[in-house]
Amino acid sequence: MEEGEKRLKQEDCNEDKIGTGILTLTNRRLAFDKTQSRIMDFSKRFGDTVVDVPLNDVSKVWKEGRLIKKVCFTNKTKESEQTYKFGVFNTKDWLKNIENAIEENRNQ
């Protein structure tokens, strides 16, 4: 993390296209680190950071699903838009925290 960056929320979750990993919300960005785990000894290793989106680049945040609930966001890049869907435990809380972090980041 960069200087002045604070971790607001972090959770082990699954992204629809990328797979399992850890979703992290800071006061500046959303990041998703891929993980690898082994069942034999219950170990888990961090892999590469595959999603690293500044909060200024997040154009839309929403939640979806009835049985399998997901928190989703769309990232604007110069070329296109990318949508990510994360299966987290408490989608309502994640949605509120992401929206608040985006608002606070814009007000700085």
Model region roles, listed by residue range:
Residues 1-28, 33-35, 45-50, 65, ...:
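Anionic N-terminal interaction surfaces
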Residues 37-42, 57-74:
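Short acidic, Gly/Pro-enriched loop/turn segments at secondary-structure junctions
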